[in-house]
Curated annotation (Swiss-Prot):
The active site is at 314. Its main location: membrane. HAMAP family: MltF. It catalyses: Exolytic cleavage of the (1->4)-beta-glycosidic linkage between N-acetylmuramic acid (MurNAc) and N-acetylglucosamine (GlcNAc) residues in peptidoglycan, from either the reducing or the non-reducing ends of the peptidoglycan chains, with concomitant formation of a 1,6-anhydrobond in the MurNAc residue. This is Membrane-bound lytic murein transglycosylase F. Keywords: Cell outer membrane, Cell wall biogenesis/degradation, Lyase, Membrane, Signal.
Length: 486
């Protein structure tokens, strides 16, 4: 007969050992989030495509949020891996997923609704929500003026929460939330008159106003708010504590302020250059560097006046300028480009011009053979400005739209779409300030035409010196920019 008591001596030791193992294993803590990040050697971060957060340009990855979080990853001694979210809901849903991002760095503002999903770090930037309207339209002055206006904001944003609260007081306020756009799209829609108003943070306005000349700030909607990073909800404070310590450190040592100055501290818009000013620059600045333009242009088989026009557009023929993104010198070379072109000192005008000439020739050589002159030159200039990857994206989009990807006239219509989510989401290299290369090329072509004209033997000398220079119209819709020193 089966007897349970007969089994007890046989399995007693096994049961005791098993129970002891389970008890001990329960006492072993799993690695916390910070420990896992260090063990993996990777900090996974989710963000948004925006000039104020993260995007890729000819310098590579850049943006205020990117630089701030890259320094954090460097402090941890790990690699930074960036992922971009399709919209705000997607961003918050990604944080804390298994093998997913452990941190969201995207200019986020805390709210009671968001605190149900994530936990926020200490603040690193103060921003103010601003109502944006189109110049020439009636300017709203208070919340009551929002009634009857066509308004759009990002879905899931704190701005949508603000409008929802206002609607309780002003039931006539109507607004649309969209997850198919980004802030740049909203500003463009106001600029083009597609919507009447939008609500965005002041830092986004500062970063984008130069590209959308029709937008204006109507008024601030509420007080300044704090932007923070976000981590997953829960009781594991390891990563959050490390983030707060890091943000406190960069606040105290000045790193944070330097980043703020780089991205938000300058209104680096030159404005329209009149004939007299341009003539003065031709007389006072160009002669210092003309021999270098001619020598290196000849060596690289490009027109020296085209090379000089690039230098004027980039720096106004000033050798010691540095932009907010770190490009430097007369030809405004990135560090990577300078190294690749054999430039050891970007502030040396001779070296800078040499690097610019080699880089322009390199850009032309990289283009498909199907692109013929003069389009080949304009494509090379666009690649010089925005990078060959984004240019290739625009050419592919042009082909899909039934346009000729080898003609600048067609591709320049497509490039601005790279700043619109519905288009850049379909590309390999993502968001770009696609309007910049269009204006870059247009201005250089005009400067080139001017230089070609005034450097004719019969026009050199007195006419330029006296300022008797007829300057063809420079694109006023997108002024040239003079990089401001850090």
């Amino acid at each position: 007969m089966f007897s349970p008591t007969a089994l007890r001596p046989r399995y007693a030791k096994w049961l005791i050992a098993t129970g002891l193992f389970l008890m001990l294993s329960g006492c072993v803590d799993k690695p916390n989030t910070l420990e896992r990040v260090k063990e993996d050697g990777v900090l996974r971060v989710v963000t948004r495509n925006s000039p104020a957060t993260y995007f890729q340009d000819r310098s590579g990855e850049t943006g205020f949020e990117y630089e701030l979080v890259k320094r954090f990853a460097d402090d941890l001694g790990v690699e930074l891996k960036i992922e971009t979210a399709d919209n705000l809901d997607d961003l918050f849903n990604q944080v804390g997923k298994p093998n997913g991002p452990v941190l969201a760095a995207a200019g986020l503002v805390s709210s009671e609704q968001r605190k149900k999903q994530v936990r926020f770090s200490r603040s690193y930037l103060e921003v103010t929500p601003q109502i944006i309207y189109r110049n020439g339209q009636s300017r709203p002055t208070d919340a009551g003026d929002l009634v009857g206006k066509k308004i759009m904001v990002l879905k899931g944003s704190t701005h949508a929460e603000q409008l929802a609260e206002l609607k309780q007081k002003y039931p006539g306020i109507q607004y649309e939330e969209s997850d198919a756009v980004e802030v740049v799209d909203l500003l463009r829609m106001v600029d083009e008159g597609q919507i009447d108003l939008t609500l965005v943070d002041s830092n986004e306005v500062a970063m984008n106003q130069v590209y959308f000349t029709n937008i204006r700030v109507a008024f601030d909607l509420g007080d300044a708010r704090s932007q923070s990073w976000a981590v997953a909800a829960g009781e594991d404070n390891s990563l959050l504590n490390e983030i707060n310590s890091y943000l406190d450190k960069v606040q105290k040592n000045g790193t944070l302020q330097r980043l703020k100055d780089r991205y938000y501290g300058h209104v680096d818009v030159l404005g329209y250059m009149g004939a007299t000013t341009f003539a003065q620059h031709l007389q006072q600045r160009l002669p210092k560097y003309e021999q270098h333009f001619k020598a290196y242009a000849k060596k690289e088989k490009v027109d020296w006046r085209l090379l000089a026009a690039i230098g004027y557009q980039e720096s106004l023929w000033q050798p010691a300028v540095t932009s907010k993104t770190g490009v430097r010198g007369l030809m405004m070379l990135t560090q990577n480009t300078a190294q690749a072109m054999g430039v050891s000192n970007r502030l040396d005008p001779k070296q800078s011009i040499m690097g610019g000439a080699k880089y322009l020739a390199y850009m032309k050589d990289q283009l498909d053979e199907s692109i013929q002159e003069p389009d080949r030159t304009w494509f090379a200039l666009a690649a010089y400005n925005v990078g060959s990857g984004h240019l290739d994206d625009a050419r592919k989009l042009a082909a899909k739209e039934g346009l000729n990807p080898d003609k600048w006239l067609d591709v320049k219509k497509i490039l601005p779409r790279l700043s619109q989510k519905q288009w850049y989401s379909k590309t390999r290299y993502g968001y770009a300030r696609g309007g910049e290369p269009v204006h870059f090329v247009a201005n250089i072509r005009r400067y080139y035409d001017i230089l070609t004209w005034v450097t004719q033997p019969q026009l050199e000398g007195d006419q330029v010196a006296e300022g008797n220079l007829h300057v063809p119209g420079i694109d006023k819709s997108k002024p040239a920019q003079e990089p401001a020193p850090l």
